Curated annotation (Swiss-Prot):
Originating species: Trichodesmium erythraeum (strain IMS101)
Protein name as catalogued: Methionyl-tRNA formyltransferase
Job of this protein: Attaches a formyl group to the free amino group of methionyl-tRNA(fMet). The formyl group appears to play a dual role in the initiator identity of N-formylmethionyl-tRNA by promoting its recognition by IF2 and preventing the misappropriation of this tRNA by the elongation apparatus.
Keywords per UniProt: Protein biosynthesis, Transferase
Catalytic reaction list: L-methionyl-tRNA(fMet) + (6R)-10-formyltetrahydrofolate = N-formyl-L-methionyl-tRNA(fMet) + (6S)-5,6,7,8-tetrahydrofolate + H(+)
Length: 336
């Protein structure tokens, strides 16, 4: 039986931990996760999703603030004599000392097709850059950031209306399967690690607050990718208020084939009328039952779901009705 110590923290890591716990060939002897954090109105200490699963399965949980500087945790890791350390979105950098402890090494699953999108936010940036596909890569960890030799890969398509949350859910489940396969094949010596080609590497840094602000002078597709890549945080201003744009649809014949049934009306309405041109950031049309269409630096964008500050998320059509947004009578400009 393969002895595993699992390092992980957020919900993304939970499917992998559960997959390992359910496999009779694997024994998860301990879990290392981030310390509990205070959240909510009561400022209560809340455990990480990974800790909650571990506690439910009576697995020892270690929560050092800095794992590589914590002598007690280092001793526990050393004494455990694990075959593999599995690392999934743990949130701390592991030292060379830790990486060299397990017999077969430290195995990580990363949510991109390495060497592309190394770093903290691979899912978000892959969507932002308009990638048609993403995936998971398992690798043997080294001291670099996602630079270790690769083991197995999987490929996942990214649809026009997918966002960071929907893709993360898919990758979390896929990553669990891929990592389990990796461990079993690694134990049987069926995998030859492949070094990464650093010349092909791209990076996915931490997202800054400034990345969330919409610049309407960009193209409709670029803005659409920004909104779904950084979902649910992108915003603009409307009548002096912050307006979160939660979902959009780029308008044009090149996008019709990817629309779900409930949006087929957009093709019929737009195709039956001549295209309109307005100032950048201006609502050029309000489509009944769908919502406002905004002029961008190149092309048009339908606001499908929005959220005014302090309000609930509503459809673009309900937003247009609630704010009396009428093209012709009132030409509202969404300012940057």
């Amino acid at each position: 039986m393969m002895k595993i110590i699992f390092f992980g923290t957020p919900l993304f890591a939970v499917p992998t931990l559960k997959k390992l716990l359910d496999n009779p060939k694997i024994e998860v002897t301990a879990v290392v996760t981030q310390p509990d954090k205070r959240r909510g109105r009561g400022n209560k200490l809340i455990p990480s999703p990974v800790k909650s699963v571990a506690v439910a399965h009576n697995i020892p949980v270690w929560q050092p603030r800095r794992v590589k500087k914590n002598p007690e945790t280092l001793n526990l890791l050393r004494e455990a004599q694990a075959d593999v350390f599995v690392v999934v979105a743990y949130g701390q950098i592991l030292s060379t000392e830790i990486l060299e402890m397990p017999k077969l090494g430290c195995v990580n699953v990363h949510g991109s097709i390495l060497p592309k999108y190394r770093g903290a936010a691979p899912i978000q940036w892959s969507i932002y850059h308009g990638e048609a596909e993403t995936g998971n890569t398992t690798m043997l960890m080294d001291v670099g950031m996602d630079t270790g030799p690769m083991l197995l890969k999987s490929i996942i398509p990214i649809g026009l209306l997918d966002n960071a949350v929907s893709i993360a859910e898919i990758l979390a489940k896929d990553g669990a399967d891929l990592l389990l396969e990796t461990l079993l094949r690694l134990e049987d010596k069926e995998i030859e690690p492949i070094p990464q080609d650093n010349s092909l590497a791209t990076y996915a840094p931490l997202i800054q607050n400034s990345d969330y602000e919409i610049d309407w002078s960009r193209s409709a597709l670029d803005i659409h990718n920004q909104i779904r890549g950084f979902f649910p945080n992108c915003f603009t201003s409307f009548r002096g208020q912050s307006l979160k744009v939660m979902a959009t649809i780029p308008v044009g014949t090149e996008y019709w084939s990817e629309l779900p049934p409930e949006l087929q009306k957009l093709e019929k309405v737009w195709s039956s009328e001549s295209e309109v041109v307005g100032n950048i950031g201006e609502v050029v049309k309000v489509i009944k039952g769908l919502g406002p269409v905004v002029q961008t630096g190149s092309g048009w964008l339908l606001l499908w779901q929005v959220q005014l500050a302090g309000k609930k998320v509503v459809s673009g059509w309900d937003f247009a009705n609630g704010t009396r947004l009428l093209v012709g009578e009132v030409s509202e400009v969404f300012s940057r």
